[in-house]
Amino acid sequence: MKPWYVLLGTAIVAIGGIFAYCATRAADGPALASSARIDLARYMGAWYVIANIPYFAERGKVATRDVYALDADGNVATTYVYRKSFDDPEKTMGSLGIVQPGSNNAYWIVRFLWLIRADYLILEVAPDYAWALVGQPSRKLGWVHARDPAMDDAQYRDLLGKFAAFGYDTSRFARVPQFREQVGRAGFQ
């Protein structure tokens, strides 16, 4: 009989491989690219997750944000902050974004536990860095980020229109509750 830690390690690698395949496999149509030029120093800091295409790791979370910090090697240390409900304490998950050369800082390979790899593509950022649209070349996942946790409906619709111009099916996006009164409202997770 194999020790339990060998079986656990094998299971983690297998699950990581499945996730990496699902997160990076191409969608129908040409792969998405970005022409954005990102000033990494301005991009660092807290970004609230206003909306996303829900998937297992973020589905059902509330009051979420990503906090980015540039490390000495030029990589981006990321802390995902979330709550399972507004009554629960904050929890965090960490990852490392490796900025890809020649991408104008817009394309990162993100590693979770060094086993799982995902694409991170900054499609567009506001001139004042108040919001950012983030996706993947496959268009499987997407996020609306903002420096402020509150975003009015008109601006949100405008940003979804930008995602549509990038070839996304915007009906797949759902807003993330940042405030207790948003829970259960139409259009929110």
Regions from the PLM with identified roles:
Residues 2-189:
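A beta-rich soluble binding module of mature secreted/lumenal proteins
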